[in-house]
Design a protein with these regions (language model features):
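Flexible phosphate-sensing "switch/lid" loops adjacent to ATP/NTP-binding sites
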Residues: 1-155
Length: 155
């Protein structure tokens, strides 16, 4: 017997699941406070996205550190489950066990945005939200890296 989730990935596209879940997301300031970060330690990039300012965080380097799981490479399945889906699944699973957990994933390249490879945002019920800002540049850092590389090539 298969358990049915109201947002069944077998019946709905990833974007439909994201659109249904995004209105219920916590504001990024609340997420940061839940992890013990102060407002001065984050740089909001809209209501749902922020960067963590490394300067005020240096004072925390003397505190005990948690555990770390590094997902560096994986052979994607035929359904496209790769590193991002694995990381998001780990975060969701450990969170369901009552652990305080976060995940860090790299910003996707523009290839997924233009449907040239996987979405790089996970999929189904294990995807990165908010989906559109994540897929379309998030904080703009990837554009800065691209421009720096282009400048280095012509200089």
């Amino acid at each position: 017997m298969r358990l049915m989730h109201p947002l069944d990935p077998a019946r709905l596209a990833d974007w439909q699941i994201a659109a249904a879940l995004e209105p219920g997301l916590k504001p990024i300031g609340q997420v940061a406070r839940d992890f013990g970060l102060e407002d001065r330690e984050i740089i909001p990039m809209g209501p749902l996205v922020a960067k963590i300012d490394p300067v005020p965080l240096f004072a925390r380097l003397t505190q005990p550190r948690g555990r770390y799981i590094d997902v560096t490479a994986i052979n994607p399945t035929p359904l496209g489950e790769g590193k991002t889906t694995t990381i998001l699944g780990l975060v969701q699973g450990l969170g369901a066990m009552g652990l305080s957990v976060s995940g860090a994933i790299r910003q996707p390249s523009s290839g997924p945005t233009f449907n040239l490879k996987g979405s790089a945002a996970g999929g189904g019920l294990a995807q990165c939200l908010p989906l559109a800002p994540f897929s379309l540049g998030l904080t703009g850092d990837i554009d800065c890296v691209t421009n720096a590389n282009n400048l280095a090539m012509v200089a």
